[in-house]
Amino acid sequence: MSLIRALHQQLIDQEISAVAVAQASLARIEAVDDRLKSFLQVTAPQAIAQAEKVDAQIAAGEPIGLLAGIPIGIKDNLCTKGIVTTCASQILRGFVPPYESTVTEKLQKAGAVMVGKTNLDEFAMGSSTENSGYQVTANPWDLTRVPGGSSGGSAAAVAADECLIALGSDTGGSIRQPASLCGVVGMKPTYGLVSRFGLVAYASSLDQIGPFARRVEDAAILLQAIAGHDSRDSTSLDVPIPDYTQALKPDLKGVKVGVIMDAFGEGLDDTVNEAVQTAIAKLRELGATIEEIHCPRFRSGIAAYYVIAPSEASANLARYDAVRYGLRAEADNLMEMYTHTRAKGFGAEVKRRIMLGTYALSAGYYDAYYLKAQKVRTLIKQDFDQAFTKVDVLVCPTAPTTAFKAGEKTDDPLSMYLSDLMTIPVNLAGLPAMSVPCGFDDNNLPIGLQLVGNVLGEEMLFRVGYAYEQATTWHDRQPDLSA
């Protein structure tokens, strides 16, 4: 059952008020977030004001949309007018955007209640949310472990029931990997389906905004609300947005599922492999035909990504110069102001990626690195195109492991980067993909199944994800934070 629909019905039947729902969400945050640290800031006054508007509409007999009165967390790299937006970086400490991002604007119009801005790896660069310039978010299933990243705050908040749904951004796996590690549904839409206007850029050709939820149907409802063309984003797709919930069916008769064989093997935990194989068997039980698919360049994605993404980041992050907003370091002249501010304001991982990108784009190395990486990107896209001539949807693990201990990989960037081995190729190809819970390991840590669709294949992903969810009970399990 959709949690959004259930709450929506209670609201319109006036069994509960939107203000009471908002207060319950805020109380939950107050009760558990000192341990979790999912939120960088809680926007209680704005949440109550929005909820009061929804209650007034209901009292006046006006119709309300499905998201009206629903508590939502917003990743803190999405601009919110009049509300501090930091990207979890000291360089943007205290920055208040003068405008609203397209997605948050749409959510406001839909009546959704933003309860706060969620933590992330600084500028969305990381796989554990340990790179935040402010705090480290814990995994609700085991507070000594990471929630994944970079959208770890959003994933943890939804898993811990601090909010019903949340928004994240996904550049190389930043929605799907934390969704897997926190046991929730996370979706990265087709590149261009959701406007990036107001999303603070990391790698512009890869970034995409998407939903977190505890049910597939709720993710579909949230995507429905934020998708659509926007003239303020030149990469926005001008395509009709279907009603994604119409695609939800309890069986998979006639659906062809391809298993990405290249995702299995070295680096994959045995428990993750077992859970995913069991999930694939369940898809077959539901009526799908299963076929082995080879994407020969699948594992080359990570090498190409760590040239392309830092290159774009080095250009995008050049704008933080301390002139108009954010941190400004003391200096005797302009050049010193730039260098001192950036040295002080950016964290180690952001500096690492800026340097990598600047190097890859430099004269004499551009052809050897950046151009070659773009060629590999094209080949990866061709592999996926070839696969989708045979099947409707592809499956593989979302992440090679379950949640690792905080601090375990901070001194080993390469090991950390491998957390996104399965998710990165999808971003390089601009495809939609979703992680759905498919099991737990021996430590009671969640495992995610990644579903990959063709361009604009969101309906098929929701269909497969929903059918699998209906046939299993993984989504019913919740972390115990009562201690």
Curated annotation (Swiss-Prot):
The active site is at residues 75, 150, 174. The keyword Protein transport does not apply. One of its GO terms (biological process) is translation. Gene3D superfamilies: Amidase signature (AS) domain. Keywords: ATP-binding, Ligase, Nucleotide-binding, Protein biosynthesis. Its EC number is 6.3.5.7. It catalyses: L-glutamyl-tRNA(Gln) + L-glutamine + ATP + H2O = L-glutaminyl-tRNA(Gln) + L-glutamate + ADP + phosphate + H(+). GO terms for molecular function: ATP binding; glutaminyl-tRNA synthase (glutamine-hydrolyzing) activity. GO terms for cellular component: glutamyl-tRNA(Gln) amidotransferase complex. The keyword Repressor does not apply. Heterotrimer of A, B and C subunits. Allows the formation of correctly charged Gln-tRNA(Gln) through the transamidation of misacylated Glu-tRNA(Gln) in organisms which lack glutaminyl-tRNA synthetase. The reaction takes place in the presence of glutamine and ATP through an activated gamma-phospho-Glu-tRNA(Gln). HAMAP family: GatA. Belongs to the amidase family. GatA subfamily. PANTHER family: GLUTAMYL-TRNA(GLN) AMIDOTRANSFERASE SUBUNIT A, TRANSAMIDASE. This is Glutamyl-tRNA(Gln) amidotransferase subunit A. It comes from Synechocystis sp. (strain ATCC 27184 / PCC 6803 / Kazusa).
